[in-house]
Amino acid sequence: MQVSQLSPLPQLGRNPRLLPVSTDQAAAPAGPYSQAIAANGLLFLSGQRPVDSESGAIPEGVEAQSHAVLRNVVNVLQTGGSAPDRVVKVTAHLADLKDFDEFNAVYKLYSSPPYPARTTVGSQLRGILVELDAIALCDVQPAEGHPR
């Protein structure tokens, strides 16, 4: 696992301090976005889906999907120079809010006090039951020779 070449995005005219983070240990993006972006000591994770990175399979049920999503989140965090205990904000998306308690029981296994700020919302998810995005502190810096 590694940060994707820690290169700026000059073709998009973006700030060179925005560093895309990518790992094959989490679900590949389903569209034109990064798994995460590191910027100024923060790591911004895109919505992580419950897709197994090796098989591409989506597990059945809220509990299994919650574990899959949170494993993907942990892998992206680690790749981006962070960890679960450095997460400051989480947004959890549930296809059905009646699944809140089941999701929450799994979520507790992957976090500890002081818990990050969190919002849980009902969302129209395409073929999945759970998705999660997060913001965390990180240690990723631009590669040598890149502007800071």
Model-derived regions: residue spans:
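N-terminal presequence-like segments and the immediate start of the first folded domain
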Residues: 1-71, 75-88, 94-148
